[in-house]
Amino acid sequence: GGGDTSSKTDNGSKADNGSSDGAAKIEGSIVDDSYFGDEGTDSKPVTLKVWAPDAAVSLVKEQVEAFKKAYPKRKFKEISVVAQGEKDAATNMLNDATTAADVFSIPSDQLNKLVDAGVISQVAFKDAVTEANSEETVKAATLNDTLYAYPETNDNGYYLVYDKSVVSDEQAQTLEGILEACKKAGKKFIMNAGDGFYACTFAFTAGVKIDGLEKDGITQKFVKYDEDEAVKTLQAFAKLIKDYRGTFQSLDVANIASGFASGKCGAGIDGSWDTASNQKALGDNFGAAKLPTINVNGTDKQLISMFGYKYIGVNGSSKFPATAQILAHYLAGEECQLQRTEKLGWGPANKKVQESKAVTGSPVLKAIGEQSLNACVQVNIASTFWDPMANLGNKIIADTCDPSDAAAMKKLLNETISNVRDEG
């Protein structure tokens, strides 16, 4: 492979000329020039659009420049990199795939609908990708034995981030300790309880478990759970939040880093993607831990979260399908994953990068790794899951919520599950 930045490391796929990859050689994230076919020739210069989340745009632009240098024989007219939040990428793809990006980032739960709609291409370099990335990330992007997306991260989850000058490491272990420390210092604790991605923590901690989809492929399947215990747990959350009204604030996670910077926030539940801004705001006082416990009638229960992976997908309507695949493979390759870990703090799916110092020395990735053992994996999530969970969160934190009313809490829980299953 050409290009000095990109071909130094080999991700173990050197000998990869397996069935799905054709016979031409693939060296790490660089493939044989012949894969381009007639794309990138004088008569057919390449024009592509890439969607990346805001925080990653400038780095992805650099990576795209390195990609072009890696294939000096090919003509690239323009490869644009545009900011696009991952959670809305699939919706925008489904609205109009012809105007959407050729290469885009998505969270693991969005894959099903893109495959069902037939707008995402299967991965061209399956053997190389399977060998380079951790098994669970490959498995979560495989439907009916077909790999549909390039693993990008294994860290799409959230953790406790805290100001060590406000919350001690010991206090950080319990929700009660965190709220008390924040209250004492006159600071806020921020959790976006009105967003289903975070609010499902209330239900999961209460013992509610999901198990993929029913046979119809649409309806969320739930595992039987102890309703009394679940109600008591939701009551405990409601009471604690009521007791710390004014300290507990439900705001978008973007307010956590800005709150640290302005001195208004003491701790929050934030995602791995905000690592760099939180570290910058807190400096030496940056603290990271798995989510805390909550005391339910004398027993400390670990908060259970949502956890998933992020992927790079290729648009099935791309006018440059070969180049789009080659670029996706490059951006999801070892070097690019390592750069995103080092510069953005993202947790890699690539097995070699997982062993790098950037990962082993990261308190955030350690915290997220610990939390992933107490999490529901974000695959096969019904599209009807998020809004009822957001409603559950909003009801629990509402001023009108009465934590002592078990019957009302039971009704809310049953309605939430019924709405997730769309049984209205």
Regions found by a protein language model. Name each.
Residues 16, 369-424:
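Conserved C-terminal helix/tail region of periplasmic/extracytoplasmic solute-binding proteins
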Residues 22-37, 106-158, 170, 176-179, ...:
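Hinge/lid segment of periplasmic solute-binding proteins
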Residues 28, 32, 43-55, 74-81, ...:
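Short, well-ordered beta-strand elements
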Residues 66-134, 165, 170, 259, ...:
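Extracytoplasmic "Venus flytrap"/periplasmic binding protein-like
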Residues 148-152, 158, 177-223, 265:
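Extracytoplasmic/periplasmic solute-binding protein
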Residues 219-250:
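Glycine-centered hinge/linker elements that transmit conformational signals in sensory
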Residues 280-343:
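Extracytoplasmic/periplasmic substrate-recognition and gating elements
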